[in-house]
């Protein structure tokens, strides 16, 4: 069973959580894209929802599927956010931001009454950190900010390298908000809360990809032969 099949299986399990009339945060990434396609089918069948996208890519995908959209200025409180994750541990702590949408993703998730993560089971880890942790930073003073982030990483008991993210073309990546992304390749993060606090103390940091105490549940799809087996962390 392929990775896209598992992502679709996780997304299928999340679709029944979406009720008529909901104000829905819609995530970014390949698993969220599978959810958007399924949600579009439900909308065309008569489901009434209003979505708030977490990126320009998600906005375009939702418009393509005919999903009605609004902004957080229109809907400052949401009922539910469905989004993917790059890693999730047993305490529902996440690393997100592989799609460079971490700032908007976190704003939307925190504005929601509930957040449910959808992912294939390979994203479930014992300790966060194998996936590079994205840190969104202001372009002004990026060199000084990078050095301050390095110091914060060391104080949190982590080691590794910090690399500015680039596009496939080789150009430095800019987020939808016009910021840069530093990827922290740490291997493991023994104390996510300490690292989060340290990063927040750096003035040039706009946001980081540690989502702590935000997710309510995670839907994880694993392959058993040709079958997808879906499990749930937390409570749906």
UniProtKB/Swiss-Prot annotation:
Its EC number is 5.3.1.6. The keyword Heme does not apply. It catalyses: aldehydo-D-ribose 5-phosphate = D-ribulose 5-phosphate. SUPFAM superfamilies: D-ribose-5-phosphate isomerase (RpiA), lid domain (SSF75445), NagB/RpiA/CoA transferase-like (SSF100950). The keyword Manganese does not apply. One of its GO terms (molecular function) is ribose-5-phosphate isomerase activity. Substrate binds at residues 28-31, 83-86, 96-99, 123. One of its GO terms (biological process) is pentose-phosphate shunt, non-oxidative branch. InterPro entries: NagB/RpiA_transferase-like (IPR037171), Ribose-5P_isomerase (IPR050262), Ribose5P_isomerase_typA_subgr (IPR020672), Ribose5P_isomerase_type_A (IPR004788). Pathway: Carbohydrate degradation; pentose phosphate pathway; D-ribose 5-phosphate from D-ribulose 5-phosphate (non-oxidative stage): step 1/1. The active site is at residue 105. Keywords: Isomerase. It comes from the Bacteria. Pfam families: Rib_5-P_isom_A. Belongs to the ribose 5-phosphate isomerase family. Homodimer. PANTHER family: RIBOSE-5-PHOSPHATE ISOMERASE 3, CHLOROPLASTIC-RELATED. Catalyzes the reversible conversion of ribose-5-phosphate to ribulose 5-phosphate. This is Ribose-5-phosphate isomerase A. The lineage of its organism: Bacteria, Pseudomonadati, Pseudomonadota, Alphaproteobacteria, Hyphomicrobiales.
